[in-house]
Amino acid sequence: MLTLSALRWGKPYKSLEAQEVVHFDTGEPIAKIGNVNGGMLQLDMKHAPRARAVLREIPPSDLLERCKKAADLFENGDLPVGDGIQSVDDFIHQQSASTGLPEHMCRSNMKKNSFVLANMDKILAALTRGLDLNIFTRGHGEEGRGVTVSYQCQSPVLGAVLPNNSPGVHTLWLPAIPLQVGLLLKPGSQEPWTPYRMAAAFMAAGIPGEAIAMYPGGHDVGQTLLTRCQRSMIFGSAQTVEQYAGNPRVQAHGPGFSKILFGDDVVDRWEDYLELMVESIFSNSGRSCINCSGIWASRHTEEIAKALAERLGPVDVLPPQDSNAGLAAFTNAKMATGTWGMVQQDLQDSGVKDMTAGFGERLVERPYCAYLRPVIAHANSPECPVAAKEYMFPFASVVKCSQKEMVNKIGSTLVCTALTSDPQLIDALTESVHVDRLNIGPIPTNRLNWLQPHEGNLTDFLYRSRAYQIAALG
């Protein structure tokens, strides 16, 4: 059984306080995490400037090559993790056992993280609009148009309070290292595997350990991190996002409320897009902010909801080792029962119909965990509260709404796939400040182009553009 220790700028620290990580289905311990408190993090912040300093000593081109090597090690290598050596299969088994995700989904998320790291040169070229990365090192330089540009680093480290439930979100903090900004992470208690393995891969690839810190612990650690770091990110609920709204130091990531919109010019051919809808709702067991939670159309909505229910309603629980397993467990059974209670309340509202009611019980309870099978609801109006809901399992509402009202009614939407060729609808969505990622045409909401920014551009978050003038001394 592995013991994971805090990393104090690359150096393991053996804590006297350990927390067990248990198997979601058996309750058996699979690892121990040595917890620390916020006081240690606060004390160690005095070394944060060194994290950026050691990265600035390495040319960006070399950092990008080391990222490629780290990507290969992360996906294929045996790495020192905690007090043991972790193989790829060990990683997959451990992550599945503690998060409840089927093993094939863990493998898929692993490949996604590796892909982003291996293609970091292309991703940063896109996010910086082709800027020479040496300008970030020096702080200024020529952009190529005879214009001096300057970018001021806003923090020597990027802090991140990481989640328990979704290994895919780790792609968001990976660019910090090649941008010569250190990492200060609070790993999730149920999903410490990705940050620890990634840290090991980085260091094995030649990234200085002094640039990476890991502080497992309670809420005080997360709060200290967010208070002390000049730039940090946190993953949580809609309330978390609201709490940090307007705080320029914190990038808060929450529910996506991602949607598929049918234009009136396409909706009569809705059957052509059934597979797209199923994938958008069901991929990664519906756990991601990029999963579709709402399908909006002016007509055929009950037919669409019925077809989705017929596809997803029969999906049942399978063992996590099964390559056909489509549902992730709620490792906290009370969270599943609480979520199901909220869903039941939504389904009882006027104008709402449970389209999966005829496909058996949705809540599946086990001794140590629980599952929620897919739910498809039909809402005859965007005013139904269910039209604005998102849950951590395959759940979607099919909403009847006129095309002219859609853009004003959909609300906050991380990913919007618009199935239309109507120039007016496309222009309205393009101008909407409520839509982040916009897909025009048949692109599932869960398929991201990593050459595009996701929930903001990390380079703009870590670096501020400023004036920088130089004149020769007489």
Language model features with spans:
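N-terminal Rossmann-like NAD(P)+-binding subdomain of aldehyde/semialdehyde dehydrogenases
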Residues: M1-G144, P314
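Rossmann-like NAD(P) dinucleotide-binding subdomain of oxidoreductase/dehydrogenase enzymes
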Residues: R129-E279, P453-E455
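Short glycine-enriched loop/turn motifs at secondary-structure junctions
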Residues: D25-P29, L226, G254-P255, S288-N291, ...
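ALDH superfamily catalytic-core signature
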Residues: A204, C229, S237-S381
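Structural signal for hydrophobic packing residues in well-ordered secondary-structure cores
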Residues: R52, R56-P59, C67-D78, T99, ...
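Conserved C-terminal structural/oligomerization subdomain of aldehyde/semialdehyde dehydrogenase
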Residues: H23-V36, I58-E75, I207-G209, V278-E279, ...
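Short, flexible loop/turn motifs enriched in small residues
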Residues: K11-L16, C153-Q154, S166-V169, C369-Y371
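A generic structural motif
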Residues: A213-P216, H253-G254, P319-A329, S421, ...
